[in-house]
């Protein structure tokens, strides 16, 4: 299942420092797909794939001190237009 993850940074310098030092810190079972960052660098819009939102909460626990998270299950617009609904 795909998830749009919206990360709102409380302290972007701390986020980028931790990322450089430790990487994404994602648990096994979560696959990073792609991400885009707002031009001010304070918000990241990320697509991840995993079987359960619970895995995303495990990942977020490594960052919650400096980032607020929102998880939204998503499907491609192509899939939606073909099927009219989520499988």
Predicted regions and their residues:
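Short S/T/G/P-rich N-terminal loop/turn motif that feeds into the first structured element of a domain
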Residues: 1-33, 37-43, 51-58, 75-87
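Conserved catalytic core of Hanks-type protein kinase domains
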Residues: 49-50, 62
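A common structural junction motif
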Residues: 63-70
